[in-house]
């Protein structure tokens, strides 16, 4: 993965560009922010009433073949099944 792939994934999944390398999405559960760095990205999950969850990954640790699936996996538990 690389910064361009993360940015494309963010836009495809409803994130709005805040500025260069930063994307944000609002939904009923709260706010998710993605900050793209030079060699990594930081996902900040701010759910209403809970402490923010920070997830940082190096691009080299996310294989190209399953990159978008792994990114989606980081968001899966946002809306737990009841």
Predicted features along the sequence, with ranges:
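Glutamate identity and glutamate-enriched acidic tracts
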Residues: 12, 16, 35, 46-48, ...
């Amino acid at each position: 993965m690389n910064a361009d792939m993360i940015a494309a994934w963010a836009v495809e999944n409803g994130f709005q560009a805040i500025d260069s390398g930063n994307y944000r999405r609002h939904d009923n559960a709260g706010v998710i922010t993605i900050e793209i760095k030079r060699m990594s990205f930081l996902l900040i999950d701010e759910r209403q009433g809970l402490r923010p969850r920070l997830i940082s990954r190096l691009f080299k640790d996310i294989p190209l073949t399953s990159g978008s699936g792994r990114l989606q996996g980081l968001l899966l538990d946002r809306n737990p099944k009841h």
